[in-house]
Swiss-Prot record:
Catalyzes the conversion of methylglyoxal (MG) to D-lactate in a single glutathione (GSH)-independent step. May play a role in detoxifying endogenously produced glyoxals. Involved in protection against reactive oxygen species (ROS). GO terms for biological process: cellular detoxification; methylglyoxal catabolic process to D-lactate via S-lactoyl-glutathione. Its main location: cytoplasm. This is Probable glutathione-independent glyoxalase hsp3104. It catalyses: methylglyoxal + H2O = (R)-lactate + H(+). One of its GO terms (molecular function) is glyoxalase III activity. It comes from Schizosaccharomyces pombe (strain 972 / ATCC 24843) (Fission yeast). Keywords: Cytoplasm, Lyase, Stress response. The keyword ATP-binding does not apply. It is found in: Cytoplasm. It is an enzyme of class 4 (lyase). PANTHER family: GLUTATHIONE-INDEPENDENT GLYOXALASE HSP3101-RELATED, PROTEIN/NUCLEIC ACID DEGLYCASE DJ-1-RELATED.
Length: 222
């Protein structure tokens, strides 16, 4: 079974990137649970025409879509038995920069899944949670691992560096460098790009969401 997780602490942040791996996993007949906190509203960056395919736009507009049904039935991380799941999937959107680093129940749950041989996957800004997840030795699971995520060049192209400075955020390049990871940039910032290192799977951006989900399944079955 799959635990596909996305927490949102601030109401202005929800990413339809969540919908893309949701659909990929659903097509595989995967059983999973969404975890969400608080009220969710749209992040304009995530629902712009350039960010979404036609099918994604249709899913966003159709409140009867299975994606929205899953969100309505989402649980808090504290109410989930993580031992029941074999994949932890953290989807991005800039909102995760606010809440993932302090989401201790998610950190512990992901560590539980990882300790059982499960897969930890994350895409776009979702990987911001990874340095917070510890292995059995107490070190971050990304130490010495090869990863990717939404990179600094992409933030610059979106003119978001002033926002990073305002909130004292570190770019994901910097964050993973400090965590002792080998961060790999896609050839172009918005290319479909995924890195798999053992049971750790990361994707660079919205275009990589479906590929990251597929890679997570492949890693689980390898």
């Amino acid at each position: 079974m799959v635990l596909f997780m996305k927490t949102v602490q601030r109401p202005e942040h929800i990413s339809l990137k969540s919908c893309i791996p949701f659909k990929s996993l659903q097509r595989q007949g995967i059983v999973f649970r969404l975890s969400v906190r608080m009220v969710m509203l749209a992040d304009d960056h995530s629902i712009s025409d350039s960010a979404l395919s036609d099918s994604d736009k249709n899913a966003f507009k159709d409140k009867n879509n299975d994606f929205w049904k899953a969100i309505k039935n989402a649980k808090n991380a504290s109410d989930i038995n993580f031992s029941d799941y074999s994949i932890f999937f953290a989807a991005g959107g800039h909102g995760t920069l606010f809440d993932f680093p302090s989401a201790t129940n998610l950190h512990k749950g992901a560590a539980k899944i990882y300790s059982m041989g499960g897969v930890i996957a994350a895409v776009c800004h979702g990987p911001v949670i990874l340095p917070c997840i510890k292995d059995s030795t107490g070190f971050s699971i990304v130490k010495g691992k090869t990863v990717t995520a939404f990179n600094e060049i992409a933030e610059q192209q979106m003119n978001l560096m002033p926002t990073f400075e305002k909130y004292h955020f570190k770019t994901l390049n910097k964050l993973f460098q400090e965590a002792g990871s080998n961060f790999v940039d896609p050839q172009e910032p918005f290319d479909d790009f995924v890195k798999t290192d053992g049971k750790l799977v990361t994707g660079a951006n919205p275009a990589s969401a479906a590929s990251t989900a597929k890679a997570a399944l492949n890693s689980l079955n390898s």
